[in-house]
Amino acid sequence: MVAPASEPSADLRPMGLEELCEHFDLSRPLAQPLTLRYELARELNHACIMAATPQSLARYMAEQLHQRGLIPVNAQVVKAVELVRAEVYELREFWSKSDYLWVPPTEYDLKARRQCDDPQTPLLLRSLAEGIHKLTEVSEESVHGAIVQVLDDYVWPRAKAMDSLRLALVGALRGVAVEAIIAFIGIEDAYKRIRRRIVGLG
C-alpha cells in the first residue's frame, strides 16, 4: 500500500538569495541542524555570497565595522565588499578579510618579516613610498605603473619587493592585490604605512 503524499513542508519553499545567505551562514544558530557536510555548507554559503550584489552584502560588513567604532560611507563599504568577497565563506568573515583596508597594521607577522627583510629593504620601501607619493591621482592602474617604474629603475626582484610592500601595508602576506589596497586606502595612508614600516626596520 502506497502512503499518501504529504503536503510540502513550509521549510521547502523557495528562498531569495539574501535569505539563502542568512540561512546557510554557519555563524548563526539554526533551528534545525544542517544535514550537509560542513565543507559543502561553506561552499554553498560562498556561492550565495558571490552571487549576491555587493550592495546587499554591504550591511553585513557595515555592522562589523560599526561594532569596532568605524563608520565609513556606504560607497566605501560596497567597494570593500567587491574587493574581498571572493575570500569570504561566512558573513561574519567580512571584518577578518578586510581589516587592513580600514586600519593600519600595528604589528608585522614574524615569519613574513624573516622572508622579506634584508639590508636592502629600507631603501626598497623608501623608493616605493616616494614613487607612490608622487602620484597626482590614485587608481589601480596608476599605482601599478608607479610600482613597476621603481622596480625597473632599481632592478629589484619583483616577487620579494611586492611581498615587502604588502607586509608594510597589511602586516602580513595576505589580502587583495597591493594596487587595489593602495587605491582603496589612498596615497597618504599608504605612504604613512610604508614609512612606519621603514622606521620599524631601524
Where are the predicted features?
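Structural motif
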Residues: 11, 31-37, 71-80, 153-160, ...
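Short alpha-helical linear motifs
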Residues: 44-45, 64, 102-105, 185-191
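Small-residue-rich helix-loop
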Residues: 54-154
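Charged substrate- and nucleic-acid-binding regions of tRNA-handling and nucleotidyl-transfer enzymes
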Residues: 140-201
